[in-house]
């Protein structure tokens, strides 16, 4: 399919869309030319305790990066997601939970969710948790994860959700960095029929001598299997919630009070604790949810993301619940126990809006018609894609097979740091091109710049930057504002640098080309090459390592690691397995290298810098243009690496 082919806006969408093409142009112009008026109006999507007078107060200036929105307003996120819906829609389903086992599912109304959140808020207060304290949440995909997050927001505690796939070492690092006082977990998680030892991982993390801030661990009973128990520290969820009062008055929070920390991989060193605040974030999550998914009251919405990622925060929970929507939470995986599981869930719950990742789409695509076998999917109206650029072939398959050629695909580009959608179609306003994220959302001013920071006009390619602030933008990195400025605002002055490259076509549509820094995107999850390299080098037999990403049909990118062993050590199949398991234990299963390339030396400049550009090309099998190798200390290394590469079995 030609990249210039446009999919027209379907008549059934055009007839009742919230934003049509003319409205998009008008509103977008206003949002750029007069952000105070535009976002002042959009802020009314929420209920405020103290209405704001100021809207935007932001600076991207070097040495003075400061981001404030609605700074004199007060509100409570949980009240906006729950309390305000009770009078008219208290009996509406807030969360549909679909278990890993298809025989397990339940509907939780707004009234029931409100009661549970109030009880858990009182539980937190009884344990001495107060406004500003950090609570670590390491939970499976169960409604109690949402209860824990909303209860933190209700009392003004800051939540730090840790993805359930992370290792004890990764958990410990996040607890130490944020000084979390409490950990909320479950005995085990369940995924694709297998149990995940969540409590054991937390126990192991808390054995780290540098973890000194944690006072209690609240444990939800999910599987009921035996776990270790530390009397006094460990507390059962049910015991606490049963004796807690269902009455709780939400805390008035300033719009700029911290809401959550979410750790994301950086290209250097330890993961970064991205900090989002309350008001601007929720305005942005709710506004983007409403317009991008063309949400109408009564729609059943399903975002397949885990709560441990920003998508789970903004578009599984907070955006939908702020809008009074019914959101589906799925414990399992899209292709287990059958390739048609995702479509079976769509039919079972009559899902209207489906938001998933290219990785899932490609995995289902590989199954062919088995992915849709015996399913109807006629309830679907809007499809969405998130986590990484979607290749046109997968886009077309998704549109054709899952959506039966009648559902617009909103391919959303955004990041943990942006809080919400940045470049995305609006279903009733923008014609679609397979593989393009299309146009910017309201208030978002993207630009493409060359490596010197000069803006590139017209149809071109370059580094993707944003030239002015938006309400959902992260305010800082927890405890390290200097690193925040250094990471996002130092490469190009007075601009937010996304770390992604993009091209813009003759219609002004954006095509994301992927990371330009040393961050990998594996199955929609960001992993820093530095973090994986550090784990490899920590192995007693490894001298040096360099990690690059290679294209992978299902995961988007696979992890290719060049490894130099210590003098006297020899490669072996046993060591290969040992090293892969080592990384798995250090970081988590996601970071396990797909390929280990044993080598005696790496291509380095005379100053000792590893030439990653060359390593990327060799790993990808692209040897046509290795570029200038004259700066290498030993140009012969490249030939040797190419020879070694011939013998390596690549992942399919």
UniProtKB/Swiss-Prot annotation:
Question: Where does the chain bind ATP?
Answer: 387-389, 411-416, 500, 515, 526
Q: Report the SUPFAM superfamilies cross-referenced here.
A: Acetyl-CoA synthetase-like
Q: Which residues carry this modification: N6-acetyllysine?
A: 609
The protein's annotated catalytic reaction(s) are: acetate + ATP + CoA = acetyl-CoA + AMP + diphosphate
Q: Where does CoA bind?
A: 191-194, 311, 335, 523, 584
Q: Which GO terms describe its molecular function?
A: acetate-CoA ligase activity; AMP binding; ATP binding; metal ion binding
CDD domains associated with the record: ACS
Q: Any transmembrane segments, and where?
A: none
PTMs per UniProt: Acetylated. Deacetylation by the SIR2-homolog deacetylase activates the enzyme.
Q: Can the keyword Signal be found in this entry's annotation?
A: no
Protein EC = 6.2.1.1
UniProt cross-references to Pfam families, sorted A to Z = ACAS_N (PF16177), AMP-binding (PF00501), AMP-binding_C (PF13193)
Keywords noted in UniProt: Acetylation, ATP-binding, Ligase, Magnesium, Metal-binding, Nucleotide-binding
Q: Enzyme group, top EC level?
A: ligase
What are the names of the required cofactors?
Answer: Mg(2+)
GO terms for biological process, alphabetical: acetyl-CoA biosynthetic process from acetate; chemotaxis
This chain's function reads:
Catalyzes the conversion of acetate into acetyl-CoA (AcCoA), an essential intermediate at the junction of anabolic and catabolic pathways. Acs undergoes a two-step reaction. In the first half reaction, Acs combines acetate with ATP to form acetyl-adenylate (AcAMP) intermediate. In the second half reaction, it can then transfer the acetyl group from AcAMP to the sulfhydryl group of CoA, forming the product AcCoA. Enables the cell to use acetate during aerobic growth to generate energy via the TCA cycle, and biosynthetic compounds via the glyoxylate shunt. Acetylates CheY, the response regulator involved in flagellar movement and chemotaxis.
Show the PANTHER family listed in the entry. Answer: ACETYL-COENZYME A SYNTHETASE (PTHR24095:SF243)
* Family membership noted in the UniProt record: Belongs to the ATP-dependent AMP-binding enzyme family.
The protein, known as: Acetyl-coenzyme A synthetase
């Amino acid at each position: 399919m030609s990249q210039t082919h446009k999919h027209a806006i379907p008549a059934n969408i055009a007839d009742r869309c919230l934003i049509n093409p003319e409205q998009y142009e008008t509103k977008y112009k206003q949002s750029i030319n007069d952000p105070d008026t535009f976002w002042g109006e959009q802020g009314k999507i929420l209920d405020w305790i103290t209405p704001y007078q100021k809207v935007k107060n932001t600076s991207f200036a070097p040495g003075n990066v400061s981001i404030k929105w609605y700074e004199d307003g007060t509100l409570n996120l949980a009240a906006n997601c729950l309390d305000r819906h009770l009078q008219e829609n208290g009996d509406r389903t807030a969360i549909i939970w679909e278990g890993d086992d298809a025989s397990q599912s339940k509907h939780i109304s707004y009234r029931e969710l409100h009661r549970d959140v109030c009880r858990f808020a009182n539980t937190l207060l009884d344990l001495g948790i107060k406004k500003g304290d950090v609570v670590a949440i390491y939970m499976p995909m169960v409604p109690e994860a949402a209860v824990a997050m909303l209860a933190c927001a209700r009392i003004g505690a800051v939540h730090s959700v840790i993805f359930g796939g992370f290792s004890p070492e990764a958990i410990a690092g996040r607890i130490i960095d944020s000084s979390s006082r409490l950990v909320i977990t479950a005995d085990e998680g369940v995924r694709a029929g297998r149990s995940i030892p969540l409590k054991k991982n937390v126990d192991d993390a808390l054995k780290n001598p540098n973890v000194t801030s944690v006072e209690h661990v609240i444990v939800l009973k999910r599987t009921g299997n035996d776990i270790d128990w530390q009397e006094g520290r460990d507390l059962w969820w049910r015991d606490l919630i049963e004796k807690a009062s269902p009455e709780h008055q939400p805390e008035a929070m300033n719009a700029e009070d911290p809401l959550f920390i979410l750790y994301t991989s950086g290209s250097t060193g330890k993961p970064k604790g991205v900090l989002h605040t309350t008001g601007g974030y929720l305005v942005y999550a709710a506004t983007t949810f409403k317009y991008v998914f063309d949400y109408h009251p009564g729609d059943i919405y399903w975002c397949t993301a885990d709560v441990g990622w920003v998508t789970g925060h903004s578009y599984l929970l907070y955006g939908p619940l702020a809008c009074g929507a019914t959101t589906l939470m799925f414990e399992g995986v899209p292709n287990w126990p059958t390739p048609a599981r995702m479509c079976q869930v769509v039919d079972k719950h009559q899902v209207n809006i489906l938001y998933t990742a290219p990785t899932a789409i490609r995995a289902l695509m590989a199954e062919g018609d088995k992915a849709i076998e015996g399913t109807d999917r006629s309830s679907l109206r809007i499809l969405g894609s998130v986590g990484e650029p979607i290749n046109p072939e997968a886009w077309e398959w998704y549109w054709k097979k899952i959506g039966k050629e009648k559902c617009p695909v909103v391919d959303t580009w955004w990041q943990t740091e942006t809080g919400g959608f940045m470049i995305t179609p609006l279903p009733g306003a923008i014609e679609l091109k397979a593989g393009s994220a299309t146009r910017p959302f309201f208030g978002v001013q993207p630009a493409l710049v060359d490596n010197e920071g000069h803006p590139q006009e017209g149809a071109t390619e370059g580094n993707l930057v944003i030239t002015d602030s938006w309400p959902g933008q992260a305010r800082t990195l927890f405890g390290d504002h200097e690193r925040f400025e250094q990471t996002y605002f130092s490469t190009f002055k007075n601009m937010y640098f996304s770390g992604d490259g993009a091209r813009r076509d003759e219609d002004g549509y954006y095509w994301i080309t992927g990371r330009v820094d040393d961050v990998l995107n594996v199955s929609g999850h960001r992993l820093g090459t530095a973090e994986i390299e550090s784990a490899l080098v920590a192995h007693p037999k490894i001298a040096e390592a360099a990690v690059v990403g290679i294209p992978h049909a299902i995961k988007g990118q696979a992890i290719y690691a060049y490894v130099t062993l210590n003098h006297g050590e020899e490669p072996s199949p046993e060591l290969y397995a040992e090293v892969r398991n080592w990384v798995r234990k250090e970081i988590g299963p996601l970071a396990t290298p797909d390929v280990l390339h044993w080598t005696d030396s790496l291509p380095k400049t005379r100053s000792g810098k590893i030439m990653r550009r060359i390593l990327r090309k060799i790993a990808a099998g692209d040897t046509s243009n290795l570029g200038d190798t004259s700066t290498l200390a030993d140009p012969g290394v490249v030939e040797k690496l190419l020879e070694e590469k011939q013998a390596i079995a690549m992942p399919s």
